[in-house]
């Protein structure tokens, strides 16, 4: 079983914001692969799918960004998912919009959602897909920047970039290692 989690904040006021880039990318995967069932459990919306005979859970935590680790830990425990079978999709302010990258592990680098995941999983060794949202424009505070909405052309760029890597789920469920996913898609 594979677990793909998009980090974000719930509520209409957060739709299309930079901090919800993980949810935007996850929506593209759900659209491509579909789902057979949807549940609200473990402080999350879980979309159940099957790709190449492998069960895949697409998850949107409903804990707000800074507490995402609570939901992810609960899901991993309940469904007995190993850390190697987890990918977190999240915004990355150190990349310009349009630059995205798979990564196998590392620190939170100031990202409070990732900090929560590290805290609750007890490790920073998990797979990620970092989605560039750009640095704050001059005069912006970081918190205001990440909670600001994408410009229309930026949002389109995020959606196109997410669609372009969506085949990683197909490769991953066929047994391609995450190292090879990085080599193929980065």
From Swiss-Prot:
Its EC number is 3.1.1.29. HAMAP family: Pept_tRNA_hydro_bact. The keyword Transcription does not apply. The lineage of its organism: Bacteria, Bacillati, Mycoplasmatota, Mollicutes, Entomoplasmatales. This is Peptidyl-tRNA hydrolase. It is found in: Cytoplasm. TRNA binds at residues 14, 64, 66, 112. It catalyses: an N-acyl-L-alpha-aminoacyl-tRNA + H2O = an N-acyl-L-amino acid + a tRNA + H(+). One of its GO terms (molecular function) is tRNA binding. Monomer. Keywords: Cytoplasm, Hydrolase, RNA-binding, tRNA-binding. Gene3D superfamilies: Peptidyl-tRNA hydrolase. Pfam families: Pept_tRNA_hydro. The record marks 91 as: Stabilizes the basic form of H active site to accept a proton. The record marks 9 as: Discriminates between blocked and unblocked aminoacyl-tRNA. The active site is at residue 19. SUPFAM superfamilies: Peptidyl-tRNA hydrolase-like (SSF53178). One of its GO terms (biological process) is rescue of stalled ribosome. Hydrolyzes ribosome-free peptidyl-tRNAs (with 1 or more amino acids incorporated), which drop off the ribosome during protein synthesis, or as a result of ribosome stalling. Catalyzes the release of premature peptidyl moieties from peptidyl-tRNA molecules trapped in stalled 50S ribosomal subunits, and thus maintains levels of free tRNAs and 50S ribosomes. GO terms for cellular component: cytoplasm. InterPro entries: Pept_tRNA_hydro, Pept_tRNA_hydro_CS, Pept_tRNA_hydro_sf. NCBIfam families: pth. Belongs to the PTH family.
């Amino acid at each position: 079983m594979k677990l793909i989690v998009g980090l974000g904040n719930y509520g209409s006021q957060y739709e299309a914001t930079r901090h919800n880039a993980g949810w935007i990318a996850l929506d593209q995967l759900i659209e491509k692969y579909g789902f057979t069932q949807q549940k609200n459990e473990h402080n999350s919306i879980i979309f159940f799918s099957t790709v190449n005979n492998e069960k895949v859970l697409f998850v949107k935590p409903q804990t707000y960004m800074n507490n995402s680790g609570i939901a992810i830990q609960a899901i991993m425990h309940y469904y007995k998912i190993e850390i190697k079978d987890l990918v977190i999709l999240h915004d990355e302010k150190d990349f310009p919009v349009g630059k995205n990258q798979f990564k196998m592990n590392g620190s939170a680098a100031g990202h409070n959602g990732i900090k929560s995941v590290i805290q609750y999983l007890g490790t920073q060794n998990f797979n990620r897909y970092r989605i560039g949202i750009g640095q704050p424009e001059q005069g912006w505070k970081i918190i205001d920047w990440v909670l600001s909405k994408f410009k229309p052309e930026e949002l389109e760029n995020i959606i196109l970039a997410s669609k372009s890597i969506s085949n990683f789920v197909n490769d991953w469920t066929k047994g391609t290692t995450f190292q090879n996913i990085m080599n193929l898609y980065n």
